[in-house]
Amino acid sequence: MGLISSNSTITAPKSKGIIDPNTGELIGSDDRFFCEVNAELSEKGFLVTSADALITWARTGSLMWMSFGLACCAIEMMQCSMPHYDNERFGYAPRASPRQSDVMVVAGTLTNKMAPALRKVYDQMPEPRYVISMGSCANGGGYYHYSYSVVRGCDRIVPVDIYVPGCPPTAEALLYGILLLQKKIRRTGSIER
């Protein structure tokens, strides 16, 4: 009687995971890292790690960014936060105050009058702090490279960690830059910059 037959179990079937359509195998089933983590969890029931590794892991998954949108690249930066790309799924959430942010995205043409404000905002950010230079104008002046009022790259004012090329760069390029920054943080692994 009902939807369950008398010889079936009440428990749900074991999940199959995501199958790669090209090979027909589970995605990540041959990844050494995941195999080691699964083996350790099945044997002990918990993981052992160092405090530095745990802090680095937490920092890469909780980057708070502050926009410094100066021109048309800021439109692509806004698009990156919309549901189609949703950069928050990578642990990359916006903040309005520089005192609460880890990453500053400089998007657009930096003029000589705006350079002191950029440096002031950068100095207000807590350590460790990172800068992503987005677009050819922020990277090297762009179309306005020879103008008397344009800084030829924001790296002359603040240290830049990741350069995202393009005019304007796509939202995918910015997401790739974010992932590269997370990889850089994991690779350096230190709390101090």
UniProtKB/Swiss-Prot annotation:
Principal place of residence: membrane
Residues reported to bind [4Fe-4S] cluster: 72-73, 137, 167
Record key words, sorted: 4Fe-4S, Cell inner membrane, Cell membrane, Iron, Iron-sulfur, Membrane, Metal-binding, NAD, Quinone, Translocase, Transport, Ubiquinone
Cofactor note: Binds 1 [4Fe-4S] cluster.
Biological process according to GO: aerobic respiration; electron transport coupled proton transport
Record-level Gene Ontology MF annotations: 4 iron, 4 sulfur cluster binding; iron ion binding; NADH dehydrogenase (ubiquinone) activity; NADH:ubiquinone reductase (non-electrogenic) activity; quinone binding
Enzyme class: translocase
Family indicated by similarity: Belongs to the complex I 20 kDa subunit family.
Stated role: NDH-1 shuttles electrons from NADH, via FMN and iron-sulfur (Fe-S) centers, to quinones in the respiratory chain. The immediate electron acceptor for the enzyme in this species is believed to be ubiquinone. Couples the redox reaction to proton translocation (for every two electrons transferred, four hydrogen ions are translocated across the cytoplasmic membrane), and thus conserves the redox energy in a proton gradient.
Protein name: NADH-quinone oxidoreductase subunit B
Record organism: Bartonella henselae (strain ATCC 49882 / DSM 28221 / CCUG 30454 / Houston 1)
